[in-house]
């Protein structure tokens, strides 16, 4: 507990008290422009074109926005007075996006400074391998084969606005910035009811992705700060890879009142969670909690999480959002793979002098990953590459492109999909995905040239679109140069291959 208090005292040093004046600096909006251009295109230029402005006038509009904000008085009014003194960008979506983007850059400052200082002090190597999504699977293969149960947790949302502001207040002590954030959230709540409607929440995330993820990560950080503390206190053996994973997936931040909460409320809880081996991984809106303990212990963790969300965040979390499965009997969805722990029975012959016997009760455990065929077909169906039963269809929206552009798009999608799911032990499903994309490409080209697929293949030959199935051959020539292609193909067909350059989930994997 003393170490936790010292850690919190150190974090308080980085609390920012003067963030609001940065909202009136032009370079803040330039930083937001550069970031959003890399993610969703330029919000300055695209919005300016929609509103009738050219590219050169975008920064003139920034100066005009700053002048208006100098004269703006941000106050929260009741619903009857909401039409008075409204947000400066309410009637202009271009101004609104600029302020959202600039404010997102400002509020990230208190979180980025401590992480940079910690990396500089500890000299953490900036290895791309640790940032790869596939780097988590070898860790799971080493640890999960010795575990018994896993809880598949869907992190509940959304959270109440005032609780969300209180969470951010522990890092940002600048009162004007907090008032401005409260004004933004309540204004958006009045316009779209983003607290109650999941569709409106997704619209908010698409329109303001950087600020949305900042708010969401702040909420998750509050939940994980207590959870990770309990996990460390309740474990006898800590994983050596735990910190490396957390440093790149966990959103930095501890709350001020964490020590008080743990002292007053959780000293009895620690006696219930004595687990020598427990692992926690979070990705997107889900998390995995695996343990070597019993089913009763996992039920206690489930009750704790439900009560914690209800008491600490003031909303009811349905128990069905947490599924407890036995690893040897059930698979769980993790980062686009179906993962399961397989039990392979072995028969061992033992011999002592002239006597021999067979021991058949020996078993080994193996962590296995396979491609989820049905969800992937659903993703291809949503993207209009096939129907719901997996029958390939044409892509009419791409028929205006050139033949080379159409082929290049299909090949790139197929290559990325094969690259991401190379860790599957059964690649029949992956070859079926390639077949769907290959035939969809042929149907799209045939639709463009107003002919049939059969006539199209007869004219171009049977070797047309062979690059869809050439990914394994390219891999063999680079990684396994000394192995013949025939035996190498069999090896790639059976072996799982993890790449260390994948830093984001494939779009077709986000089927849930």
UniProtKB/Swiss-Prot annotation:
Cystines in this chain: none
A Pfam family assignment: Intron_maturas2
GO aspect biological process, one term: mRNA processing
Highest taxon of source: Eukaryota
Keywords: Chloroplast, mRNA processing, Plastid, RNA-binding, tRNA processing
Keyword Transcription regulation: no
GO molecular function, one term: RNA binding
Cell location: Plastid, Chloroplast
Principal location class: plastid
GO CC list: chloroplast
Function: Usually encoded in the trnK tRNA gene intron. Probably assists in splicing its own and other chloroplast group II introns.
Family the UniProt entry places it in: Belongs to the intron maturase 2 family. MatK subfamily.
Protein name in UniProt: Maturase K
Species the sequence originates in: Alisma canaliculatum (Water plantain)
Organism placement in taxonomy: Eukaryota, Viridiplantae, Streptophyta, Embryophyta, Tracheophyta
């Amino acid at each position: 507990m003393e170490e936790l208090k010292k850690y919190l005292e150190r974090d308080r040093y980085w609390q920012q008290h003067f963030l609001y004046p940065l909202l009136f600096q032009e370079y803040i909006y330039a930083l937001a422009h550069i970031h959003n251009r890399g993610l969703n295109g330029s919000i300055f230029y695209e919005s300016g074109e929609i509103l009738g402005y050219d590219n050169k006038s975008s920064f003139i509009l920034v100066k005009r926005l700053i002048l208006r904000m100098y004269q703006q008085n941000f106050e929260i009014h009741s619903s009857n007075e909401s039409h008075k003194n409204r947000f400066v960008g309410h009637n202009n979506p271009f101004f609104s996006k600029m302020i959202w983007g600039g404010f997102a850059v400002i509020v990230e400052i208190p979180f980025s400074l401590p992480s940079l200082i910690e990396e500089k002090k500890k000299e953490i190597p900036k290895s791309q391998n640790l940032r790869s999504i596939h780097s988590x699977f070898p860790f799971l293969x080493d640890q999960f084969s010795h575990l018994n149960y896993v809880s598949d947790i869907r992190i509940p949302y959304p959270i109440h606005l005032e609780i969300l502001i209180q969470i951010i207040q522990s890092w940002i002590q600048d009162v004007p910035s907090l008032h401005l954030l409260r004004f933004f959230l309540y204004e958006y709540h009045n316009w779209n009811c983003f607290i109650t409607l999941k569709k409106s929440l997704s619209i908010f995330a698409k329109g303001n992705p950087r600020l949305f993820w900042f708010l969401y990560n702040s909420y998750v950080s509050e939940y994980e700060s207590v959870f990770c503390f309990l996990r460390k206190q309740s474990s006898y053996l800590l994983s050596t890879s735990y910190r490396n994973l957390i440093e790149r997936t966990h959103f930095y931040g501890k709350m001020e009142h964490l020590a008080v909460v743990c002292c007053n409320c959780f000293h009895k809880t620690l006696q219930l969670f004595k687990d020598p081996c427990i692992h926690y991984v979070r990705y997107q809106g889900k998390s995995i909690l695996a343990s070597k303990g019993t089913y009763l212990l996992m039920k206690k963790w489930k009750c704790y999480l439900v009560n914690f969300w209800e008491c600490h965040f003031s909303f009811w979390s349905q128990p069905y959002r947490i599924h407890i499965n036995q690893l040897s009997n059930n698979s769980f969805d993790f980062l686009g793979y179906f993962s399961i722990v397989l039990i392979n029975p072995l028969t061992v012959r033992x011999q002592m002098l002239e006597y021999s016997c067979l021991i058949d009760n020996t078993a080994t455990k193996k962590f296995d990953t396979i491609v989820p065929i049905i969800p992937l077909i659903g993703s291809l169906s949503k993207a209009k590459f096939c129907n719901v039963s997996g029958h390939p269809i044409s892509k009419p929206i791409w028929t205006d492109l050139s033949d080379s552009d159409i082929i290049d798009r299909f090949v790139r999608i197929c290559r990325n999909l094969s690259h991401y799911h190379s860790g599957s032990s059964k690649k029949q499903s992956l070859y079926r995905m390639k077949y769907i994309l290959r035939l969809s490409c042929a149907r799209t080209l045939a639709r463009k040239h107003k002919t049939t697929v059969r006539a199209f293949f007869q004219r171009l030959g049977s070797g047309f679109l062979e690059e869809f199935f050439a990914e394994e051959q390219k891999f063999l020539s680079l990684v396994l140069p000394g192995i013949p292609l025939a035996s190498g193909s069999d090896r790639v067909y059976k072996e799982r291959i993890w790449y260390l350059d994948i830093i984001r989930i494939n779009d077709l994997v986000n089927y849930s």
